[in-house]
């Protein structure tokens, strides 16, 4: 065992703090670089391996960039509101504020022990009034611009958490938090109009340095599609409804239409004899989430209303059904069905014995879903694809029964939560004035501490008379406060702005400061946030830009996702499986740098993998080996026998490995390919060890090589490297020095090893100068003592020279 361990960690953490090494100065030289890891939720008392895998390697990247001359801003904070703390309070009786702040205290200590260069002076905690005051301000600004509104809507309701869930928080019909089956419930809720920015959210994606998969997920979630909205009239009625379709060329093949169970027309369209069946079906549909209802693997079901609609293009009468695979919140809440040319419609029609009419030629069997010439389409027969669409839309336009339409899958962002532990929505309701925004000077609307937060389906804040009753800011009369709280994603939708100016008590942020520091240059976090946090933050940035507060379009210029660290059994870590890894235990045994380097060397950063105790032991042995080599190097430099001043073969070999390492550690670290970067450092380590075995060493050259070695190692093992840097005789931090410069000339070798073959079989190897001609290489090969002996008495027919690689001799 070497000397490295937590004692060294603590020594350097103290020195860094005392010297203010990691304090950020916006006026310091160097190009600004805003590096941000997604802040953690303090739902547990300790950081887990996943936190470390996000924060440790990203800090190494930030240190690397600092040594490359960047002025790095790397803040840290806590996403402190949310359900887990409230659920923990319900279970234990410990108040969410108390448990959250205690957890934050523990996690701050752990984050400091990591040795990351976080700018703690810029810390934010979203559950504190000095932060959520400004979350409320953001909400009010959206409200002023008409981007926040209230409406009655069917929502996802978790009966266990007793709160509304956004669509993104429902996984396969279950609550992502507690796995309960999600139900549908009609409630008056607050929404943010993210749909106003649908086009820009889509169009600006391609210009971002983000993983393609994440961009594809956002594109799918926004779901822009160009099609046609056609109007169907209900038979013997004044009622009409619209359907949206991207395949208007198949309109003649419509044999039935389907309405969402929640569609307000269903009750008026359902005949008396069908009412019982339709009502029963509606009740069942309420138990399903939107995502579950649209699952491609789930069998589609429906029930007939008893009414008929008229196809606008051919006048045919088609039955009106109710089906839960149609959503009231998507498109018009009504769809036309063309079973001959749509797989879902075909399965539904076959199940319920509904007509199937081919209107497109092609394919050996139905359903045929490609484009083709129209048949059974009257005046449109023979038309193909876009030509057919144009002709049909023209007729619909003439009859005022349809037109071109762009549709989106994206829905407005539901932000109301019927829970306690969140930012109160800054709105009051007055009998005289209606809905009134709380004036900015009255912010924050603070959460009361003494509250009954046991869930019963009502907002806990509604049970606090002190909180509930207030004065109307407009008329001075009695008013009641909004008792829902904001979705925690509202808090995290703008936090990257507050970091820059976190102590500002007059504004959410200083406009000049934010526009100087933003956007975030490198953002690192999990891919699970693709359609929630990452989308919401983009929306809020654009909204604040349009209000004049920001001068940039996107919050995060470059995005990197870390992979997942699994348990030793290869499964996702969980307490119930007993496969969790406690970083503190390993840090205590091996030190923070061994833990950090294991995470970076043991896994491809974007992929992750299964934890291995054997692998972290191997990394500990490697650090011990480095410590021995560096100690031996210092001894050799002090030894008077080492008098060499020339650069000869041994020095050239080490210099080659040195610059090869500089080149590839630089390139790989830049791309977050830490495992291969550390592999190059390991090769450099072996070359150093080999050089130390030389009889006479060039001490000046060795010191240069060691200086570059420690610099290369520093971002990956910051405490250990600072210690070795000091032992080398330096008085300033290694992180105030410049990154080693790669010299391409060092990779041009004076000699190269070649193989010598006879009749295609290798018989010898030899080193030759790299500047020899083919004739000189041939002569050198034939004069090799081993080859001369093997060729004795033989006739040389031909000698083939492959420069820099081999010589093949053909002889008989």
From Swiss-Prot:
The terms describing its cellular component in GO are:
cytosol
Tell me where it resides: Cytoplasm
Q: Which residues bind ATP?
A: 575
The UniProt catalytic activity note for this protein reads: tRNA(Leu) + L-leucine + ATP = L-leucyl-tRNA(Leu) + AMP + diphosphate
Q: Which UniProt keywords apply?
A: Aminoacyl-tRNA synthetase, ATP-binding, Cytoplasm, Ligase, Nucleotide-binding, Protein biosynthesis
Q: What Gene3D superfamilies does this protein's entry cite?
A: 3.10.20.590, HUPs, Isoleucyl-tRNA Synthetase, Domain 1
| Bridged cysteine pairs (disulfide) | none
Tell me the Gene Ontology biological-process terms attached to this UniProt entry: leucyl-tRNA aminoacylation
As annotated in the record, motif 'KMSKS' region runs over: 572-576
Under which EC number(s) is this enzyme classified? 6.1.1.4
Identify the Pfam families for this entry: Anticodon_1, tRNA-synt_1_2, tRNA-synt_1g
Q: Does the keyword Ubl conjugation apply?
A: no
Motif 'HIGH' region — list its residue ranges. 40-51
What molecular functions are annotated in GO for this chain?
aminoacyl-tRNA deacylase activity; ATP binding; leucine-tRNA ligase activity
InterPro entries tied to this protein: Leu-tRNA-ligase, Leu_tRNA-synth_edit, M/V/L/I-tRNA-synth_anticd-bd, Methionyl/Leucyl_tRNA_Synth, Rossmann-like_a/b/a_fold, tRNAsynth_Ia_anticodon-bd, Val/Leu/Ile-tRNA-synth_edit
Q: Which PANTHER family match?
A: LEUCINE--TRNA LIGASE, MITOCHONDRIAL, LEUCYL-TRNA SYNTHETASE
Family, similarity comment: Belongs to the class-I aminoacyl-tRNA synthetase family.
Q: What is this protein called?
A: Leucine--tRNA ligase
